[in-house]
Each structure stands twice: as structure tokens, then as C-alpha cells.
Amino acid sequence: MKFKKILLSLLICLSCFVQAKNITISRLTCEMQEGLVVVEGSPRLGWVMESPENGTRQSAYEIDIREAFTGRSIWNSGKVYSSQSQLVSTKGADIRPDNSFNYSWRVRVWDETDTPSEWSSEAKFRAVPERLSSGQWIGAITRQNAHLPEGRKFHGGELKKPEVKAAWEAVDTLAKKSICLRRTFQVGDAKEGGANRKPGKKIVEATAYVCGLGFYEFSLNGKKVGNSEFAPLWSDYDKTVYYNTYDVTEQLRRGENVVGILLGNGFYNVQGGRYRKLQISFGPPTLLFELVINYEDGTCTTVHSDNNWKYDFSPVTFNCIYGGEDYDARREQKGWNQIGFDDSHWRPVVIQEAPKGILRPQMAAPVKIMERYDIQKVTKLNADQVASASVSTKRTVDPSAFVLDMGQNLAGFPEITVRGKRGQKVTLIVAEALTEEGACNQRQTGRQHYYEYTLKGEGDETWHPRFSYYGFRYIQVEGAVLKGQKNPQKLPVLKNIQSCFVYNSAKKVSTFESSNRIFNAAHRLIGKAVRSNMQSVFTDCPHREKLGWLEQVHLNGPGLLYNYDLTAYAPQIMQNMADAQHSNGAMPTTAPEYVIFEGPGMDAFAESPEWGGSLVIFPFMYYETYGDDSLIKKYYPNMRRYVDYLKTRADKGILSFGLGDWYDYGDFRAGFSRNTPVPLVATAHYYMTVMYLVQAAKMVGNDFDIRYYTSLAQEIMVAFNKCFLHKDTAQYGTGSQCSNALPLFLQMTQDADEQDNYRPDADLNEKVFANLIKDVEAHGNRLTTGDVGNRYLIQTLARNGEHELIYKMFNHEEAPGYGFQLKFGATTLTEQWDPRQGSSWNHFMMGQIDEWFFNSLVGIRPSTTPKQGYQKFIIAPQPVGDLKYVKASYETLYGTINVDWTCENGTFTLNVSVPVNTTAVVYLPGGKEPKEIQSGTYQLVCAK
């Protein structure tokens, strides 16, 4: 495509008045988060600015921090001449953990003409409470009395051993029961329970800190606080325990109040009972609670977890993160979490052992019910189908069974509204696939997992599980009929049923649309799979394993960062990785590491450089996106320990362990890498982690490490080329796509000169790249890479301008490709390119094309200058194939970038919006020189 004559036209007229450019401050953040943020030490603040005029930028700012209630001044920055508007330091501010009040802050800015804006609205934050970690943990039984087995080896064949079975069967059944806890307290008295009460004191702030393990539901005076599911986010409880912070000022009333907590097992206490991937217990369900109430007169009262609480069994009679959930509504105690309830028959709690992990505030967004889906199709199973399905599903299918197609594969649970007689039961079996008979099929995803609801018989009853979820599209209902259906057996009537799509509520920050149907649908397919697996961690699948496999964190990292606000989620992922790191520096393949893979054939699953490398690689992706180097600096010691560990495993610079290019493609069932040698992939990632560590050493200012690891990287690169490069053919390894793409991507195509010094070899690079293209073309413009190689193949082609080839590789409806999955009827990305081969139908590990959609088709990329984090960025769209248009938006820390281009009738038209206080470097297709534009809205036109 050749373009000539560039026309640049402004869409926004310049103001004719000499005045302030009407800068308004629209979004205040603390540690890049909105709302009430809990901080350790002096926080970093940020703000987004808007202006109706082009070219607006900040020249100075002033920050004012006060105590929210009293208005007492804490810190003022004065006028600071700087364009920085994100991650602005407040070092020197007296933020004290013993202060129970919130802090408020505001900011004003000056534009490039030194004209000030109005003060912004106020935002709040509060310090991490220093006394919370000394609180008491309460529950129904201590770990010691529960006789819970210890260790992380309980999976697979280990669970079948008689001694292991006996150990788990010896556990006190009380240790896995869901319980309700309650406590009454007074509000409005100068001294709670004291003789000199002063009624009528006004509450100015009330903050609750809650940690209920494994999961909890928190209520005040009978009403649920917040709308999260599966709180707190799960972790390695021996290392880190998260608690949640709630502003409950409006929920309290003067006089008597009641706090209620419902506890479930979660990943804290996986004891099995039905399907389970593993078993592990950190202890029986437990609660840590603290409520701090500040009054207008300056006094403060605290309600905390202690032996004044009571508990009883909840209506949740079974709950397992892997196996499902049962609920007996007959066991509900009306008003149990409200004033006036008689709890004389409830039991006193016991003081339990605290989890070993460090208490940390949960900064990442909670998991919530984010979407709901209604019935799309109903199928009643006949007698023959019921009989046959009872064999194929290995469970007795009730003759009343019918199957609902909800239209969307997702992670979550059903919600029902049902009416029937007391004691009647409704069973819900969920699955993402169907058997030949049309019944729900969990063979590939872990069986048995189901939900059972026992009615109380009091009108309409609405219920959904609280402590378990699964991946499913279909719901098999047994023991009920749908409203309007014949009901000769007088079964309960389902008046409504929905699929609840449950995932992390981290903000979606982008949109993408093109004129290509397959690309649009592939983007949606990947998005649904990502959301299904974006829970407390990035899981591999929402049913069979629910484990945080680490390779997808960096291999899909750019795509994830283009689509979601990971400012708080990513630091938690890093904490999980640091917690999972072994004492010798080794990194497991999963974090949290709930199971240690041991035994014959399991070594590759225990640790693999492509998986563990996320510890080193992902912080740099975070830094490029947000301009925040804190993760690199915080986890530098962990990165170094991991690289040092890999060095101990290397033989003359070559690593020979791991999973390699997992699930690569060919005329075989996907699994272990077949096309590309495992040592090649492992060693390339070893080199990559060392190169990133060198960059990290420069950022932390460690000169010794810079020299040492630069030398190590050179040694690895030399060993790699000596071992895998075939000079006569300019092929690496087997000559597979992954074999050649990896060294090209990492710029390892080097050769020795006459003095035996290795230097970049342009001729070699060109020949290897030509071989890569030949292989893609020889396979009919199809890939042969897998989970690991996909990104390197796509991005190597893109970096070298082969966008037309990438377009051909994915603009079709054959396997391997997204179009084939769409043609098959998939609604989430599947584990294998050909879903008919089995395995999970809800994996996002093959979703690397999303990065290309944004950094190439749309053309938005962070700048390569030191100004990371999109204060300066690139827009370089690539019109390819028969694309007529692409339009997208991407919300950065500084505001939203909009890109909308069309290519019609020989003219390429690009419309862009650049946020205030940022600069875009625009490359037009075919143009030689970029154009640098400041904030505002522009149209750029190229005539063919």
C-alpha cells in the first residue's frame, strides 16, 4: 500500500480568548486506585485532566492533604513545577497507621500558560491499621482439634493411598462445616457497655476490616455489605492473608447493632467430598474482624473478633471450591443477623490459631457477579436418554431431568427462583459440554460437581451458591419443572433461572472493533475466556484445576494490559509469585502453589522456565504500561534468586527441563511439545530472564549485578547458538516456527567474528527470518506453535512488517485458528485449537492475537523513550488485507486514547484523541517521518 500527500486537520477550534484552557480534573487516584484506598506509608497520587482545547499540558501542581473529619492540615506540596500527574510522591506527609480517621486530598494544576485550574473534588485514603494483626481469630474448632493433615502433596494417585484416605477421614467433620457467626454491639455511647453513657453521639466514620477464611459473607443489621463473591481473594495462606476494608458509616444505627458473618471453605480448606483436583487445608473456617467507629466528639470505639461472639451451623450443608455446594433452606434461622434474634442456643466461638501468613489489605478489585444470562434453549431428556446418560456420566440421572442451554460458556454458578413444598430438592448439574444423549458432560472438566437446594416451602425462594463455582454453558435440572410446564408429580416449579458470570471486577479499559467478522468474534471469544479465568488469580480453567498457571501471565500479558486495569491486580499476582518461590530460588509453575507436583512424569509440571519466568518478565510489562517501577524494585531480590537458581540447573549454559512449547500444533493430540526441542525453549527463556534482570539491575543501581549478569547473558547466548544453530541452513533447533521465532524475537541471531566475539549478524537474522516465513507458508499460512511459541511467532512477524501474513494466518475458519472455534460454536477460547480433541473449552492461553489487534491493527503502543506509562506513546496503525476500518479506545492512567481509521476509495483517514498532558507520535502507513502531536483531537489523511 503506497500513500502520498499527508493532510493534517484539527477538529477542535482554538479558543479566541486569552484565558485558562478550562482544565478540569476528572479522576483522582491513590496508588492508581479510586475510592477509599488503604495505604502503607506516604501514598502516590494521580489525576486525570480534561480540556476542550488542543495542546493542553500541565506545568505545575499543588497537592493538599488533610484529616477528613477534622480538616486538620497534614501536608501541602506547595506549587511544584512539574508535568508529572501520575504516581506523584507525597514523601514527607505525616501518614500515621495509628490514626483511625480517613485522610482527604485534593489537587490543582497550572497549564502551559501558568494559569491555575480550580481545586479538584476531594478523594480519601486511610492508613493500614497497625493493630489489626494482633486481633483474635475465631471459629468453631481449632486446627489442632480438627486433626487436619498437613502438606501440599495430596493430588492424583496420592489421594488413593489407604494411609492418605485414612488421614483425611479422621478429620473432625466440624472442621469443614460452614458456620454463621454473630455479635451485637452498641453505637452512640461514650464507652461501650459503660455506666456513663452519652446517647446520641454522631458517627463521623466507621470502617470495618474483615478476613473470613476461606470465603465469607459480611452483613450489618441483616443487610449484606458490599457485593463481592469469594472474598477475600485467595492466596498462599502460609505467606499472605488478605483482608477487606469497608466504609460502613451509613449502615450503622444508633443503639444496638448486629454484625453477621457466614463462613465457607474456599481454597483455605479443600477437604474434597466430590470432585477435587487436590486436597489442602490451612485450617478450619476462621474469622478476623475489626470495626472502628469514630464519633464527632473525637472518641472512638472498636468491635473486634473475640470470645464474645457466638456461632451456629449455616444452611450451607456442603461446600467445596471444586465439588459444588448444597443448601438446606429449612435450616435458615430467620433474623439471625438482625436485632432481636434469640441466640441463646448458639455456641460460643473458640479462639483459633492464626494463619501463618502476613496480613495485607486487599488492593485488587473483588470478584463479583458481573453478567447474567437467560435460557436460550430447553431440552427434556427422554427415558432412553436418562438411562444412557446415567452410564456415560457415572451418576444416576433423575427421570425429571431437562437441560438448559444458556448460550454462553462462563465461570460462575446458576441462580434460581423456585416455589415448592418444604423438603423438596432441586439438583443443578452444570457443564460446558453435552454427552451424546444431551446430558451435561463433566468428563473433561472434573466430575462430580453439582448444586443441591432443599426448599423451606415459604413462597418464592431465590438462591445461588456462595462458596463454589464452575465453568459451564449448560444446566441440567433435576427434581423440578420450569414454570408453565406440565407437572403431574407436583415437583418444585422453577420460576426463573440464570447463569451468573462471576469474575474479577477489574475495570475493562478498552474497546476494539474492525470490519473483519472473525477478528471481532475472536476478540470477544478471548475476552470471555479471560474473564472466566480472571478470579483471585489468572486461572488456567474455571473447572478442572482453577490453578494459577504462570506462563499465561507474561505470554498474554500485553493483551491483558490492553484490556483490563491491572494496576492493583498485577501487584497481587507478583505477591503470589514471591510467596510461591522456594527457598533455593526455584519457581513453581503455579502460584499460589497449593499442590507440589511430584512423582513419575510430574517433574515438568513442577517447574518450567517459561512459567517461572513470569516473575522476572511481567514486572517490565507492568512498568511499560503504567510507568511504575515499584514491582521491579520490590521483587528484584526474588528475580535474582530465580536467575541464580536457573544457573545451578544449567549445563554449560543450556537448560533442559520444563514443558517447552506446550500444546503446539500438528497432526497429533496436543500436549507436550513435539515440534520444538524443550532445551531450546527453556534456554531461550533463561536468556530472556537474565536480560531483563540486567535491566532491573540498572534500575536499582547495582553495578556489580549489571556486569555479572551481562556476562552471564553473553555466555547463555553463545551456548544457545553453538547448541541449536545450524549455520549451513540458518535454522535453529528443528527449524520449527517456535525454534526460529524465539531467537529472532530475543535478537539471539548472533555469530562469532574472527576474534570469537559474538555480535548481531544481520545476514543470519535475514536468513532465519526467511526460513520462518517459508515454514508458515509451507503449512498453508498456518501456525505450528503452541502456548509458548504463539506470542513470539506473531510478534516476530509483526516487528518485521509481516502483517499481511499474520492476517492470512488468522482470517479463516480452519484449524488452527480462532475462526474454526467460532465455526464449531465455541463461546470462549478453547484449550486446543480443535475443540473436538477434548480438553477444556474455557482456556485463554492461546489468546495472544489480542496483543496484535491493539499494537498493530489499532497501532497503540507505549513509547520506547524513558517516559513509560503512556505519557508519551505511539500510534502506528497497520491497514492490512481487506480491512475497511478499525476503531478502538484505550484508557490509560492519563485518560482515554481513541483511534478510528478507515481505508476506502484510495484514502486512509485516521481520527485520534490524545489525553491532556500526553504526547502521541503518529506513524501513517507508508509515511517516512512520524508526526508528534499534543493532547486534543485530530484527523490525519493520507491519499493513496
Residue spans for each PLM region:
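Active-site acid/base region of carbohydrate-active enzymes
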Residues: 215, 286, 304-308, 312-313, ...
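Hydrophobic h-region of N-terminal signal peptides that target proteins for export
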Residues: 11-19
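Extracellular/oxidizing-compartment recognition motifs
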Residues: 23-544, 551-552, 568, 584, ...
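C-terminal capping/lid segments that line or modulate ligand- or cofactor-binding pockets
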Residues: 259, 327-328, 545, 563, ...
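Sec-dependent signal peptide recognition
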Residues: 2-9
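Non-catalytic C-terminal accessory modules of carbohydrate-active enzymes
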Residues: 279, 286-290, 303-336, 340, ...
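Alpha-helical support elements that line or immediately flank enzyme active sites
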Residues: 206-210, 220, 413-432, 475-480, ...
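Helix-terminus loop motifs that line ligand-binding clefts
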Residues: 223-232, 236-238, 436-448, 567-672, ...
